[in-house]
């Protein structure tokens, strides 16, 4: 008997990475950090890595305490995962079933349509235009028309940059609540613009904020991200997490990044100067 995968998988096409070797190359469209980390930072990180870290399973509750303290939220409003896409995948795993409608922008983060196909969701993209485009108005119309299960918004979006302000995000969430829709605000580039939906997570019960350490912090190779939301949504996402959602090295790396937050802030300043 021939073994077949789930039907949805037949609709998923993934292109292989074009680089046969990464040595000496940067993928600029993914906004990888091109500047070296300070030698003092690298030296301190290396000294902090012990043989014990390699031999034992990670004690993850410590990093939850540190990251939640840094973000000024409660432990039960946070889940850590592999990159921003790890958070998006958890949301799809918990909330999205076959036939559910999902609104995203197009073009935007490449994994949105992939996850829609994986879970049999109906992808309802908003096709962005470069000039004279009322993105906020079109988004509201799309929500009313499609009555989606999920609205996933990269804020700011890229490669075509559109962005919602806090009042607009709140309005989108309240509109979506009328249809029982979740709203993901993907804040991968939040540190470059300082507009964040984080203050709204306790007020709006359908809001999920996803972030990554890959962009402003510049550690894309380590695949670290996190999601913040109300405790109910986070509790559901935690119920399907792996046994250990972050490894021992990455926990120490995150601690050093937070401790040396000026490295990130200075990098962001340099990026702004170059624009």
Regions found by a protein language model. Name each.
Residues 2-83, 90:
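N-terminal small-domain helix-loop-helix segment of the aminotransferase-like
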Residues 31-34, 84-85, 109, 155-160, ...:
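Short glycine-rich anion-binding loops that position phosphate/pyrophosphate groups of nucleotides
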Residues 74-78, 99-101, 187, 205-206:
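Short acidic capping loops at alpha-helix termini that bridge into adjacent secondary structure
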Residues 94-153:
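PLP-dependent aminotransferase-like
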Residues 104, 125, 185, 209-211, ...:
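Hydrophobic residues in well-ordered beta-strands that form the structural core
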Residues 131-146, 159-219:
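Active-site pre-lysine segment of PLP-dependent enzymes
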Residues 206-275:
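PLP-dependent aminotransferase class I/II
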């Amino acid at each position: 008997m021939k073994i077949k995968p789930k039907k949805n998988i037949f609709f998923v096409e993934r292109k292989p990475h074009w680089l046969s070797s990464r040595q000496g190359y940067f993928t600029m469209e993914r906004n990888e950090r091109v500047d070296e980390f300070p030698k003092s930072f690298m030296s301190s990180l290396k000294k902090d890595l012990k043989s014990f870290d390699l031999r034992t399973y990670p004690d993850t509750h410590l990093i939850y305490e540190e990251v939640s303290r840094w973000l000024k939220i409660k432990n039960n409003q946070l889940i850590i995962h592999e990159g921003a896409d790890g958070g998006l995948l958890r949301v799809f795993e918990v909330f999205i079933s076959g036939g559910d409608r999902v609104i995203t922008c197009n073009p935007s983060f490449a994994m949105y349509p992939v996850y829609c196909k994986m879970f049999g969701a109906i992808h309802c993209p908003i096709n962005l235009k470069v000039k004279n485009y009322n993105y906020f108005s079109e988004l509201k119309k799309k929500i009313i028309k499609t009555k989606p299960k999920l609205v996933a918004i990269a804020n700011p979006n890229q490669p075509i940059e559109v962005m919602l302000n806090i009042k607009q995000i709140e309005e989108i969430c309240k509109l979506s609540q009328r249809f029982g829709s979740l709203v993901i605000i993907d804040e991968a580039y939040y540190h470059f613009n300082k507009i964040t939906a984080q203050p709204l997570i306790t007020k709006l019960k359908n809001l999920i904020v996803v972030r990554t350490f890959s962009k402003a912090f510049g550690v894309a190779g380590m695949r670290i991200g996190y999601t913040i939301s109300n405790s109910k949504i986070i509790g559901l996402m935690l119920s399907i997490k792996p046994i250990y959602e972050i490894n021992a090295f990455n926990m120490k790396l995150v601690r050093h990044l937070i401790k040396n937050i000026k490295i990130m802030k200075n990098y962001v300043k340099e990026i702004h100067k170059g624009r």
